[in-house]
Amino acid sequence: MKKDLEGKIILLTGGASGIGRECAIAYVREGAKVAILDRNFEEAKRTVKELGSQSCSYQADVSEPKGIETAVAAILKDFGRLDAVHNNAGIVGPSCPLHETTEEQWDQLQSTNLKSVYWTTKFVFPALVESKGAILNTASMVGLLGQQDHAAYVATKGGMISLTKAMAADYAKYQIRVNAVCPAGAWTPMLEQWAADQPNPAGIREYLDHIHLLGYCPRGDVIADAAAFLLSSKARFITGCILPVSGGAELGYKR
């Protein structure tokens, strides 16, 4: 039986660890070849080694356009084409209200989480036109609902959600689909570190279980399964979709 992503070439940013790593595993499992782009090259190489010959790693910081441009050129040279891009790289930023956020923190969040989508799209667009490909963005439920003491981060994810819809409208004429997944929470190294840095780590874990109506905070593989679906031909008539992968958190969300 043919796999859902058989023969697809997927560029995945932030694929070395966390949700990105789980997505890389899912894409390879479904038959894709994955080009992992990450600033942590050593971690990316370890992930590629685990995945085998169906993946390659490329070093770039998504907040720096030159690195993205160079990596995209290398990927196209190595693979010959590109069928999908998953903009997954991101950072969480400070736990404070907007007026306490420094300009440096604001700019870094915007560059990494949101402006990076602009740069990847700019450099991969011709290849996606040729392949009639797909773009997937990793957003967040907080981009839809807001969250206390995370205004700068929320702004980037809210912007990504609106951008996803606008891109879907712009690129439909090229048969390029654009969608987003919205986790509420998922245990990753980044979230583990964030939780550990809070005044009450045990309380944070209880909170993260509580906000999901299904009763637990998942691992990244549940996000990866949804992402693999949205990049597959099974989702061929889905574009502009902001898909909650949230265990129903939006139905009873507590800030």
Annotated model-derived regions:
Residues 126, 169-173:
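Alpha-helical segment proximal to the catalytic Tyr-Lys
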